[in-house]
């Protein structure tokens, strides 16, 4: 059975890595993805509402997204929300659906996105290491108070370090995958 301290550490680190993974999914890659629109809110009867709660978003094969609002009167609101976002895309409203065409990104844009992905992953690594530092301090306090032995402290420190290495490696893999996704075209 796992030690509660190790279990708590693993849960925190996993949560941190999952958060970074979600952030990377929202990063633009030149490839259309409905996840890019998750943060955009549409004025739905005075309430800011995510696009995916008022419309269907589909990826088409020709490098575009099709947004079909469930209510036709939302077309203009969805279009305005996309224009106001920082995606830099020009929505085309044909009266029934909104089409978002993703132009082929320049090498410079791709490099900028890779740098952004690297920054996001670096923040994740810092979070994982901060969790390790916090838990190691907890272990020192437990030993100082006589709640655990020196052998237990060393064993737990080693387990915590192994978890840290595991999750930092996982973050590196997430970055490599995202970098590959950004650079391929």
From Swiss-Prot:
It is found in: Cytoplasm. Keywords: Cytoplasm, Protein biosynthesis. It comes from the Bacteria. Its main location: cytoplasm. One of its GO terms (biological process) is translational termination. GO terms for molecular function: ribosomal large subunit binding. Pfam families: RRF (PF01765). GO terms for cellular component: cytoplasm. Responsible for the release of ribosomes from messenger RNA at the termination of protein biosynthesis. May increase the efficiency of translation by recycling ribosomes from one round of translation to another. Belongs to the RRF family. This is Ribosome-recycling factor. It comes from Thermosipho melanesiensis (strain DSM 12029 / CIP 104789 / BI429).
